[in-house]
Swiss-Prot record:
NCBIfam families: lolA. This is Outer-membrane lipoprotein carrier protein. Belongs to the LolA family. GO terms for cellular component: periplasmic space. The keyword Amino-acid biosynthesis does not apply. GO terms for biological process: lipoprotein localization to outer membrane; lipoprotein transport. The gene is lolA. It comes from Thiobacillus denitrificans (strain ATCC 25259 / T1). Keywords: Chaperone, Periplasm, Protein transport, Signal, Transport. It is found in: Periplasm.
Length: 202
């Protein structure tokens, strides 16, 4: 299956002069749901773009999320609170895993997990660059493919994330048309494998 990245969008609504860490903690304490459009770019260690994608995401804390990749391939990622479902429409293949085994140390835990954020990450303010206020999160678990995650805020909004993995790749996520605490139907976080799809892991 092609690489899929568990990324999340959010809006923060606290003081503009707060650092990135304070903004993230305030969001986790107050936001229950979010949805947004996204564009995603993956670059290798030589800064060569190897993958571009776009789509729409939504989450409901704790532990429920959905990422719909619309281009260049149709792919779906769903966390239903207990299991993680990865569906590749082109391959007609579904991969399912227990959510707890894969969420720690990923952006899913950082943004859609529970309130114990510093159980999984070391957080620090990373200063201002490119007109954004940055936060850096380093996973405490060694059993993760991410070395660090940077989150860039403009005013009260998270507009960009950068994920650095153990293979030297950088994934950049840019957000638009986001909504904070929208009403989201519970059925959006339920995934039923399409009839005839190859299901791996269940």
């Amino acid at each position: 299956m092609r690489p899929l990245f568990l990324l999340f969008a959010l809006v923060l609504t606290h003081a503009a002069h707060a650092g990135g860490v304070e903004r993230l903690k305030a969001f986790i304490a107050g936001a229950k749901t979010a949805e947004a459009d996204f564009t995603q770019t993956v670059a290798d260690r030589n800064n060569r773009v190897t993958q571009e994608a776009s789509g729409k995401m939504a989450f409901a804390r704790p532990g429920k999320f959905r990422w719909d990749y619309r281009a260049p391939y149709e792919q779906v990622i769903v966390g239903d609170g207990a299991k993680l479902w990865l569906y590749d429409a082109d391959l007609d293949q579904v991969t399912v895993k227990p959510l707890g085994e894969v969420i720690a140390g990923t952006p899913a835990a950082l943004l859609a997990g529970d309130d114990a954020i510093e159980k999984y990450f070391s957080l620090k303010n990373a200063g201002e660059s490119g007109g954004l206020e940055w936060l850096e999160a380093t996973p405490k678990s060694r059993d993760t493919s991410f070395e660090r995650i940077r989150m860039g805020f403009k005013g009260d909004v998270l507009v960009q994330m950068e994920l650095f993995d153990t293979f030297g790749q950088r994934t950049t996520l840019k957000l638009s048309n986001f909504a904070r605490n929208p009403r989201i139907a519970p059925s959006r976080f339920v995934f039923t494998p399409p009839k005839g799809a190859d299901v791996i892991g269940e």
